UniProtKB/Swiss-Prot annotation:
RNA-binding nucleolar protein required for pre-rRNA processing. Involved in production of 18S rRNA and assembly of small ribosomal subunit. GO terms for cellular component: 90S preribosome; nucleolus; preribosome, small subunit precursor. Pfam families: PUF_NOP9 (PF22493). One of its GO terms (biological process) is endonucleolytic cleavage in ITS1 to separate SSU-rRNA from 5.8S rRNA and LSU-rRNA from tricistronic rRNA transcript (SSU-rRNA, 5.8S rRNA, LSU-rRNA). Residues 1-43, 648-710 are annotated as: Disordered. One of its GO terms (molecular function) is RNA binding. Signal peptide: none annotated. The gene is NOP9. Belongs to the NOP9 family. InterPro entries: ARM-like, ARM-type_fold, NOP9, Pumilio_RNA-bd_rpt. Keywords: Nucleus, Repeat, Ribosome biogenesis, rRNA processing. This is Nucleolar protein 9. Pumilio repeats lie at residues 90-125, 126-161, 196-232, 280-321, 329-367, 369-405, 520-557, 562-600. Residues 1-16 have a biased composition (Basic residues).
């Protein structure tokens, strides 16, 4: 017999991989005491109840029912509700084994999403005394989360319902079922469930599935917004769960992405939960939790909501020292680990961003452990830089300006084009500068041009400008631009495009630089950008006109418009390009010849444009029916647009500064009007004298006037 392979190595490697370790320079912390030991010791308290297997006949029926609900091809709401009722009748008494089955758990989740309030209560009743087991289960925990969200909506409805709604609900109960459970308020059922979880709270914190249930319970008790279960930045589900829900097409209903009213008893339950959890923690274990991949988000949430029920902020002071205390060597080592660890930095960033911690707590940590090395932390592109970004919007104005003074002169060095590092830092610096009254704005602009367009002359841009600006930011070479395999734009491309759009919104100099880069591109490459799902937005955002535009910029605008010649019809018939053609209507203000040229190009292939869904929208937005049939009215639209650009509408109170040629024309018109008035007065005087001479009344009047003067 050959030598047998020793067992348990994979598990040992995995535990070592997941085990958080402090750096060697972290003093006074026991590096041997890892959270893995706590995890292994707590697993003994995890309930593991077996609810039975679903047989093949039942499985086929429930799979078909799940598919029917997924397609949702019911003719009416009543038909769908009838189908749900029949499935619930078939599932009665089998709910627990269905939610623990991979396939049937999807059906139960759909049933809960579509169920009415009475049906929800029935399902809730079936789960009683088994909530803990379901929370620790891989599939059942997802069903339980959906049930909790809908239960929160039902609790709010019971709190706010009118007498008429109560009467209607009572009638529905009598018609559907005589079960006494429907007479019990949902609030009482929910509190009963909360009591089931209390002995297991410390075990739930670091469990892969139960921790998500615990976070949702805390959000409901605190009356916070319950996030979506499918959006990428949701705190409700894990990343894998959100991807899976998209693949199986389970969508949230209107109960997600909102907060609910909660009864006063929930505050007491939240206080009890916080006290129960904190009783099982000390400073060492709490700090270990804060750098634990699963436990850290739970601790972040507890710090965020503890202020609702605990003035002393026990969780915060369990991890960090009191605000009256000075620098501590153990705390300093812990903060240093947070600033250099991926999980720890996310924990610190989250508690700074959220409104749970008091500003003086954050200010203490900043002054003691971060202020003297702001620039060094900003160079940690995967950890410390996110802390600095969060601090920019939480500290006092003086401290924010200090951070800006440290980072702005080195901004060009901090940004890495190749590694796509610190683009977010540039974004946050711009926002912080704007919030401080455009603090050091010109320096930020110069630093960004030094980094992304070092050869570009900001004051005197020339015609031989290269494409380095958009190439360095968008990384067009190697992107999905021009691919014929229908590749989806990557998240990286989307992030870069949004950054360029941000720069163009920040200062018009970036718009001018982008125009020169567009003109330096081969026309085919530029057209590919217009057809790209992400880069088309960059083109669209660049087509803006500055108020009181100088003549040189207007000439540059004409040159940019020449690129679109012979491309209008193709763009108009494309889902992305059609938005660009729509934008050209405003971009061609004061350039009626270019408007006419674009409209003529659309008219030349009107049949093709009108056959396209997007082309028809462009045809309408450009007022092409007026262009074809009533050219004078179309010209009136252009004139109206020019008046709006100059601010000469009837409702406008401010007048623009007039150009010299306009002032000269006004002077000439005023002089001509004055001369006409003088000529008219002279003519009227001559006519009057002739009339007086003819009637003989003039001399008498003169005598009378002379007598008065005497």
């Amino acid at each position: 017999m050959g030598k047998t392979k020793s067992r348990g190595r994979r598990a040992e490697k995995k535990s070592k991989k997941n085990e958080p370790e402090f750096n060697e320079d972290v003093s006074n912390l026991d590096s041997d005491a890892t959270f893995a030991n706590h995890e292994s010791s707590s697993t003994s308290g995890i309930p593991n109840t077996f609810f039975g297997l679903v047989d093949n006949n039942e499985l086929d029926y429930f799979k078909q029912a799940e598919s029917t609900l997924n397609i949702n091809a019911f003719e009416s709401e009543e038909e769908r509700q009838g189908f749900i009722n029949s499935v619930l009748e078939e599932a009665q008494g089998k709910e627990l084994k269905l939610v623990t089955n991979q396939i049937c758990s999807k059906l139960m989740e759909r049933l809960i999403l579509f169920a009415n309030y009475n049906q929800l209560k029935k399902i809730f009743k079936q789960f009683q005394n088994h909530f803990v087991s379901l929370a620790f289960h891989k599939y059942a925990s997802h069903v339980l989360e959906t049930l909790l969200v809908r239960s929160a909506a039902l609790i709010e409805k019971e709190l706010t319902q009118t007498d008429e709604e109560q009467l209607q609900l009572q009638e529905e109960k009598e018609e559907e079922d005589k079960d006494s459970i429907n007479d019990v308020p949902m609030e009482d059922l929910f509190i009963s469930m909360l009591n089931e979880f209390k002995p297991h709270l410390t075990t739930m914190i670091d469990h892969s599935y139960a921790s998500h249930v615990l976070r949702l319970l805390i959000l409901i008790l605190a009356g916070k917004e319950l996030p979506s279960s499918i959006t990428s930045n949701s705190t409700l589900r894990s990343k894998k769960s959100k991807i899976a829900r998209k693949m199986i097409e389970i969508k949230d209903n209107e109960d997600f992405d909102r907060a609910f009213q909660t009864p006063q008893s929930f505050k007491n339950e939240l206080r009890a939960y916080c006290q129960t959890i904190i009783a099982g923690l000390d400073t060492k274990s709490a700090r270990e939790l804060s750098i634990h991949k699963i436990g850290s988000p739970v601790l972040q949430l507890l710090i965020q909501v503890e202020g609702l029920v605990d003035r002393e902020r026990s969780f915060w002071h369990l991890i960090f020292a009191k605000d009256s205390e000075g620098k501590d060597s153990v705390e300093e080592s812990f903060v240093e680990y947070l600033l250099s660890d991926s999980v720890g930095s996310h924990f610190l960033e989250s508690i700074i961003k959220n409104d749970g911690a008091r500003p003086k707590y954050i200010e203490r940590l900043y002054k003691l452990y971060m202020k003297d090395r702001v620039l060094k932390l900003a160079k940690r592109s995967t950890t410390g830089v996110y802390i600095i970004q969060a601090l920019l919007f939480k500290l006092k104005p003086v401290e924010v300006e200090y951070i800006l003074d440290q980072i702005i002169p080195e901004l060009a060095e901090l940004i890495s084009i190749a590694d796509n590092q610190n683009l977010d830092l540039a974004n946050k610096l711009i926002d912080a500068s704007i919030s401080r009254g455009n603090y050091r704005r010109d320096e930020i602009i110069n630093q960004l041009f030094i980094k992304f367009a070092p050869n570009y002359d900001i004051e005197n841009p020339s015609d031989n400008t290269s494409t380095e600006f958009i190439e360095n930011i968008l990384q067009l070479t190697g992107s999905t631009l021009g691919n014929t395999r229908d590749d989806w734009p990557t998240a990286e491309e989307r992030k870069r495009a949004l950054f360029l759009e941000k720069l163009m919104e920040y200062d018009y100099k970036f718009v001018i630089c982008t125009w020169f880069n567009f003109m330096a591109l081969p026309i085919e490459r530029f057209v590919q950008m217009c057809f790209h799902g992400v880069f088309c937005h960059v083109v669209e955002k660049a087509l803006i006109v500055e108020p009181e535009e100088p003549k040189t910029i207007q000439i540059l605008r004409k040159r940019l418009l020449n690129i679109f010649q012979s491309q209008i019809v193709g763009l108009a018939c494309n889902s992305y390009g059609s938005h660009i053609v729509d934008t050209l209507w405003n971009f061609t203000v004061l350039l009626p010849m270019y408007k006419d040229r674009i409209a003529s190009e659309l008219l030349s292939e009107s049949h093709k444009v009108k056959e396209s869904t997007y082309g028809r929208l462009v045809w309408k937005n450009w007022g092409m029916e007026l262009f074809v049939r009533k050219k004078y009215d179309w010209k009136a639209l252009i004139k109206q647009q020019e008046q709006e650009y100059y601010g000469e509408t009837e409702d406008s109170t401010e007048k623009r500064a007039k150009k010299p040629i306009e002032l000269k024309m006004e002077r000439l018109a005023e002089e001509k009007r004055r001369q006409e008035e003088m000529a008219e007065r002279a003519q009227s005087g001559y006519t009057k004298r002739k009339l007086e001479e003819a009637t003989g009344t003039g001399s008498e009047k003169k005598q009378k006037l002379r007598g008065r003067r005497r």
